[in-house]
Each structure stands twice: as structure tokens, then as C-alpha cells.
Amino acid sequence: MAYFMANATRENCQDECRLSPNRDAVEEDLKKIGVECTKVDFDDANVQEDLDQLIKKYNMNYHDEIHICRETMPNFDEKLKIFFEEHLHDDAELRVIKHGAGYFDVRAKDEQWIRIPVRRGDFVFLPPGIYHRFTTDRSEDVVALRLFRNNPKWTAFNRSENGDKQPIREQYLKDVSA
């Protein structure tokens, strides 16, 4: 279950970083910012049908797989640092976790971070223009299916640089305030 989180630093970002006392983020909190989460059962014989339904629902036509771990990813530490930098994209971010565990952090309307723990079978939809970041948990091993509407552009706009100036950010803010 998602929750509002305490400040995370690069040193502790792979920990839960829960507030004390804990404050869960319910489905309505995520819905308000355009985030959707569901489950995909990889042990079900119909898993491909479930994936096809997600692909159709979100009008995706391209996918790939990424394995985030020290053994398979060159410059692992640098990549994790990039993933954890607060950023946004022009396109939606859709991920299905096939193996391992990690955290997607997204900004609530009041600028607090909401942490979404993900593990095998979790599907996450982040709308275009939302500030977010990602990290693995301490296992440092995640395999994710990435779904795209077109071939990936991989353009990230960091908040500290020019993210707020992007037209997609303005559109996102309009969409979530409606």
C-alpha cells in the first residue's frame, strides 16, 4: 500500500522512509494526481491476456524490459542516481514489475511525496507531467516491463532545471485541478 513518506536522501532512499506515525495514501489520494495501480498475476495462465488488456486500455504499442541490478546494468550507481532525481516526462510512464522490488515516489498536490512500493505483479501508471522518481529496494534487483505509446524518447526534465517550464507540466496541473 502506498503511503506519505518522510524525506529520503540518496543514502536512505532504498529504505521504506515512512512517516512516524505512518500515514497511508489511499486509492483516492493517487487518483487525485492521476496515478493508477493494479496487479498482474504472473502465475496465472492468462497473464498474457491481462497484459494485452493493459496495453489496449492505455493505447500502448511498444514495450521492452529492463533489468536493474549491479550484475546487468553498466554504471549501476550512476543510473540509480539518475532514476532517483525528481523529474517528469512528456509521455506517461507505465511499468509492470516482473521480479524484485522498488519504490516509485510521486508528488501529491501539496508537494508531499507519496511512496508506492512495487514488487512482482504490480502495475503502475504515472501520467505525463507528474514529478516522480524511482529506486530499487536494498536488494538492488528489479525486472520491469516498460510500456510505451511510441518508441521511447527517454527525455526526462528534472525539476531543478526546467521541468516546471514544460508545457506538459502545465497541462498536468490543469488536468489534476479539474
From Swiss-Prot:
Pathway listed: Amino-acid biosynthesis; L-methionine biosynthesis via salvage pathway; L-methionine from S-methyl-5-thio-alpha-D-ribose 1-phosphate: step 5/6
InterPro entries on file: ARD (IPR004313), ARD_euk (IPR027496), RmlC-like_jellyroll (IPR014710), RmlC_Cupin_sf (IPR011051)
Positions bound to Fe(2+): H87, H89, E93, H132
Any one annotated GO CC term: cytoplasm
Keyword Oxidoreductase among UniProt keywords: yes
Keyword match Metal-binding: yes
SUPFAM superfamilies in the cross-refs: RmlC-like cupins
Pfam families: ARD (PF03079)
Cofactor(s) of this protein: Fe(2+); Ni(2+)
GO molecular function: acireductone dioxygenase (Ni2+-requiring) activity; acireductone dioxygenase [iron(II)-requiring] activity; iron ion binding; nickel cation binding
HAMAP family per UniProt: Salvage_MtnD_euk
Family, per entry: Belongs to the acireductone dioxygenase (ARD) family.
PANTHER family: ACIREDUCTONE DIOXYGENASE
Name of protein: Acireductone dioxygenase 1
